[in-house]
Each structure stands twice: as structure tokens, then as C-alpha cells.
Design a protein with these regions (language model features):
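Hydrophobic residues in well-ordered beta-strands that form the structural core
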Residues: 17, 96-97, 122-124, 269
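C-terminal capping/lid region of NAD(P)-dependent oxidoreductase domains
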Residues: 3, 120, 166-170, 371-393
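C-terminal glycine/acidic-rich active-site capping loop/insertion
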Residues: 127, 262-354, 379, 384, ...
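Predominantly a Rossmann-like dinucleotide-binding segment in NAD(P)-dependent oxidoreductases
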Residues: 15, 128-222, 376
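Active-site beta-strand termini and strand-to-loop segments that position acidic
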Residues: 231-238, 260-262
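Beta-loop-alpha module in the N-terminal Rossmann-like domain of NAD(P)-dependent dehydrogenases
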Residues: 51-114
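N-terminal Rossmann-like dinucleotide-binding module
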Residues: 1-51
């Protein structure tokens, strides 16, 4: 701590660090950015100049050896999370790790053991659970189930007691992405692991967070483990989530859609900017402002987002990658909220908003999904694997 602030080090300073981590760190008054670490010292120096870090290094062990550092953010490629976590935990540093926490079960178990042995907090950046839109979606669903109301024109054939299956909640997550934006590192089996490990851990985590305390009991997956795929995840109380991930879509339309049916009502969250509920009298649309937008359209919501997107490209030609770095344009997926919650957890000794168990569970389910694709079989989710017993010497 320095002057009542947590001293932070950033390890890995690629595009995500430049446009998410470092702006978030420097925006929070309870944090002080001391170190930036990257194998490319020229890149680290550029980020130091842009964000005002005090020191740079190419060796993460130098950061772990600094007694002033309280918190380390890891934004490296997936395969080197484990050695950094083990070093940081042994040095008593709290750790904010980019998703996936690990690529394989043994790596995840070792991470769990390290942070628990040394008594440090770990947060995994499975940020969708912290987005304002999905927080509101979950609240709307469970508020309705606690006090259901229905339109007077609801179709009822015969009054009767509901059948057990009619009590189940069902979630559909639709992801349409554009694979021309992927580098080969994303699908390299040693570095990125493919889109189930690299991306779909987000939506597996959303389902587990949304339906808790129910736990997954069965998983079925199909397609390609490295690109387009589908996953169905069934829970102990009968609820289920079905994910469809297509990499043959376009950035010209929003990437993520979440839908839930529950209690004879339908709930939809459209790309973190608008939520709607149907079958509930008086239900109103909820709008969520974008995190970054500097155009002229003042309205909020899904249609306004589409208009803002087209406004952004109205006078632009060339590779949109160039515009991304020059003119930020971003919905609120929960990144900053996750930072705020984790800082609060450290300062006030509260539970992490997405701890090492949640990080492991998303990785474990992703590995099961890959095995389901390879075997073309539905697989069980044994509770002894989903909630492992980690012995600390």
C-alpha cells in the first residue's frame, strides 16, 4: 500500500491491456500503477509513457520480488498464467488473471492450491457476470419468479397444477463473430487453445453464475473445438443453457444475445445495451449506456447502438482495425465493474467477485465440451470434479 492505495503491476501489455486493463487501472483512485512488464521492452516503454507507470521490466519475477506491489494483473497468453500465478502467490500478491484461468485441469488445480496456500485473493476476468445488462437480466428473472404477474390475456387451456418441467428455466446464448479478426495464436493448441477455451469460458461462466446454486450435471457439445460450436449445459434443478457460437458472422451486427424463458415469461438482453421482458404487465425496456462513444447520437438502446455503429463507419474506408485504435467504441461488458469489485474485496477482505473455483469450473466445462465434440457423446459433470478437494500442506 502507498498512501492508502493498492500498488499494481501489469504483466502483459498487448491490445487488451492497452484498451482495457491500463485505462481501468489508471481510472480508479484506489490504485497506483507502478510496473508494466512485457517481453517486448519497447512496447512496455510505450505503455509506460502512455499510462504513467513508474517502472518497466521484461521479467515478471522482478515484480514479484518488489515488496511494495499488492496486486498483479496478468494479461499474457494463456499458457503462461500458471508460473506467474505461482510466483505472485508465493510472494503474497493478490492476482487478477485474464480468462481462461488455465488451459488444462492440472494447471487450474495448481493455481487453486497456490492462492489458497499463500492466502491471497484471485479474480478471473470472466467479466460478463459483472456487466450492468446481465446483472439486471438476472434480477428481472428472479424478481418475476418470486412475484409472478401475467398479462390478463394469457392463453390458458385448463387450470391445473404445473408439471415439473414447466418450472425449469432455459437460457439461449447466441454468439456471432467474425473469424477474420482472429490471429493464429487464438487457435494454436499450445497458446490459445481455440474458441471454446479462449472465449466460451465466458458464457459457460454466465450460465453457472445465473443458475447458481444449481450445478451442472451434463454437457453436450458439437461442431469445432477451435472455431464454430454449440454447447448444451444441463443443471441439477432441470435448468439448461444452450450456446451457439458462429465464427462466420460479421462485426456489422452485434456479437452477443442472451435470452431466458422462465415463469411463463420471456427475457432478452441485446448486446449489453437493452433488456426487455415479455409476458409481464407493465414491463419496460431497460437501457444501458455504452462505455465508450463520442458521436452525436444521444439515444440509448439496441436500435440506437446500430445507428451509432453505422455513424462510426459512415466516412471511413480501410481496415476497421485501424479505427479501433484511433476511436474507442465499446459497450459495457463489465470489465471496470470487475476491477472495482476486486479492489473492494482486497481492501475490505471480502470474497473475490470471480474466484479461483469459478475460474477452474469454466475451464473444466470447456475441456468437457471439447471431449464431447471429439467423442460425439453427452458427458456427465461429476460433482467431485466440478468442486475438487484441494489439500494444502
Amino acid at each position: 500500500m502507498r498512501n492508502g492505495k493498492l500498488v499494481v503491476a501489469q504483466i502483459g501489455c498487448g491490445k487488451f491491456a492497452e484498451y482495457q486493463d491500463l485505462p481501468n487501472i489508471t481510472s480508479l483512485e484506489k490504485l497506483t500503477l507502478k510496473w508494466i512488464c512485457d517481453l517486448d521492452l519497447e512496447r512496455a516503454g510505450a505503455m509506460q509513457k502512455k499510462f504513467g507507470a513508474e517502472k518497466i521490466t521484461a521479467d515478471f519475477k522482478e515484480i514479484c520480488a518488489d515488496p511494495e506491489v499488492d496486486l498483479i494483473k496478468i494479461a499474457t497468453s494463456h499458457e503462461i498464467h500458471l508460473p506467474i500465478v505461482e510466483c505472485a502467490a508465493a510472494a503474497g500478491k493478490h492476482i487478477f488473471c485474464e480468462k481462461p484461468m488455465a488451459m488444462r485441469d492440472e494447471e487450474a488445480w495448481r493455481i487453486m492450491k497456490a492462492v489458497r496456500k499463500h492466502g491471497v485473493k484471485l479474480c478471473v476476468d470472466l467479466n460478463r457476470r459483472m456487466s450492468p445488462a446481465l446483472q439486471a437480466l438476472k434480477k428481472s428473472v428472479y424478481d418475476h419468479l418470486a412475484n409472478p404477474k401475467h398479462s390478463p390475456w394469457r392463453y390458458i387451456e385448463t387450470l391445473r397444477e404445473p408439471l415439473p418441467e414447466e418450472e425449469y428455466k432455459h437460457m439461449i446464448i447466441r454468439i456471432q463473430d467474425e473469424s477474420s479478426s482472429y490471429g493464429l495464436q487464438h487457435v494454436d493448441p499450445l497458446i490459445g487453445g481455440g474458441e471454446i477455451i479462449g472465449e466460451s469460458v465466458h458464457w459457460l461462466d454466465v450460465a453457472c453464475w445465473f443458475f447458481a446454486p444449481a450445478v451442472p450435471v451434463e454437457i453436450t457439445a458439437w461442431g469445432s473445438s477451435r472455431l464454430s460450436h454449440g454447447i448444451n449445459l444441463k443443471f441439477s434443478n432441470g435448468d439448461d443453457m444452450t450456446l451457439t457460437f458462429s465464427c462466420s458472422g460479421t462485426f456489422d451486427y452485434p456479437k452477443e444475445l442472451f435470452e431466458v424463458t422462465a415463469g411463463n415469461a420471456f427475457f432478452r438482453s441485446e448486446f449489453f445495451v437493452e433488456n426487455n421482458a415479455y409476458g409481464i404487465p407493465g414491463a419496460k425496456s431497460e437501457y444501458f449506456p455504452m462505455k465508450h462513444y463520442d458521436g452525436d447520437i444521444r439515444e440509448e438502446g439496441f436500435n440506437a447502438y446500430i445507428a451509432k455503429y453505422h455513424e462510426r463507419f459512415s466516412n471511413f474506408t480501410g481496415n476497421s482495425k485501424d479505427l479501433e485504435t484511433a476511436k474507442p467504441f465499446e459497450v459495457d461488458k463489465g470489465h471496470l465493474n470487475m476491477w472495482k469489485a476486486f479492489v473492494e474485496a482486497i481492501l475490505n477482505d471480502k470474497p473475490s467477485p470471480c474466484d479461483e473455483l469459478a475460474g477452474f469450473q469454466s475451464t473444466y466445462l470447456a475441456q468437457l465440451a471439447i471431449r464431447s465434440i471429439e467423442s460425439r457423446q453427452t458427458l456427465p459433470v461429476p460433482v467431485e470434479r466440478y468442486i475438487p478437494a484441494i489439500f494444502i500442506r
